[in-house]
Amino acid sequence: MARGTGQFEVAVGVIGKLRVEGYEAYLAGGCVRDLLLGREPKDYDVATSATPDVVLGLFERTFAVGAHFGVVLVATCGGADTPCGAGGNSGEQEYFITEVATFRSDGAYSDGRHPDAVRYTKSAEEDVKRRDFTINGLLMDPLRNIEEQPQVPFGRLRAGSRLPSVAQDDKHPFAAQDEGIGRDNLRSSVLDFVGGMADLEAGVVRAIGRAELRFEEDHLRMLRGVRFAARFGFAIEDGTKTAMRGLASRLAAVSRERVRDELTKMLTEGRARRAFELLDVTGLLTEVLPEVARMKGVEQPAQYHPEGDVWVHTLGLLGQLEEGCSATLAWGALLHDVGKPPTFRRAPDRIRFDGHVDVGVAMGAEILRRFRFSNEETRQILALIENHMRFADAGRMKTSTLKRFFRLPEFEEHLALHRMDCLAGSGNLEHWEFVRERFEAMPAETVRPRPLITGRELIAAGYAPGAGFKEMLRAVEDAQLEGIIATPEEALRMVRERFPIDGGGGQVNE
């Protein structure tokens, strides 16, 4: 889906068309928040007094994805006024999706996620007051300063208008520059029924109305509140935080997939450390990841971990995760030492965690199963846990062993995890530098060369198929990786010398 100014224009066009037909319509929710923060929104949502049936009839290409909740998707191609399919093959056109939701009030939430019933309303204020947080409860009228221009179709932006530049840091919530439609026009176009503007300026995440009621309606809102606070560098308002602590146990009723997705966003938005600190102080961490919560207070040997306990060390890794990092690397960083708490032992010489890698792999597998990760993601995250201690042995590895180490899928993630692990501990990057230099210097074709021989050649050479083939081929590959042999002829000669055939029909002499 296309992003940016074009999508903004399309959303404004949708609003303009609804206005022409006599309905209220505004930009709503996260896109308003992000515009005011000087960030480029990922999506533009519209809230309107028009019912879903009206929206479906007004626009040529629509999808009633949430009709029960008053949600319709409007598809537009090539520009704010071009329906999909106009002027050619719609499959080759740039297209935009705008989510249009009817003003509504919600009934009871018996499942802790969806309202049992909704009632459409003509009141924008009533619609806003059912939402989660004040910073997400703002509406914006993008036509306020341009709707007097009749030459602009459906209220499209006048030529030359543009979004405020996206802030490159979080120095201040209103970091947008006064250009194009600008900060002042943005602020003057906002409808605020819940005090969201003041909370944006103060940097506060506050539930709309009674926090307990908002969290009873949708328990996942507690995790979303933590994520917003971490992402924007905001504080959680005291009453909202108290409600989170009191209702944390309600998260047990939320589907594991929804919890997983929210945690993954926390881990990959560039504020993972702050997010998990907030999960801890709100009591939510114990509910969603008790294995991670148990890292707190687990001492480590000071000579290797001067930073402190396992929890502090793990936070040190999370603090290094960059925005947009892969989910597998992020979860690998979070869980790499999950096996330490149950293996803690105070030995005569120092604190030890014997077998913590194997225990961690088993615990990680259970956590990932619980959160219903895909098989592919599970394999990669468990591989990161399983191999994170191997770097210390790399200098003593045979060349063949080192090359097989490099064959691990997404080996760059193993390098990244080990580097973070070192920097969150002693700071010694000696092993990381050794492995990185050799990995970068080693041509891919030498790490995974074509096999010199296969089972077919062994049969042709007189060997009977059997379990011994695996050992023979492994020995050949070892020699090839070590650079001892390089041709099929050398491979067969080595096999005949190391695995001679007896006189009884191709069996190998042991």
Where are the language model's segments positioned?
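Catalytic cores of the polymerase beta-like nucleotidyltransferase superfamily
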Residues: 1-160, 164, 169-510
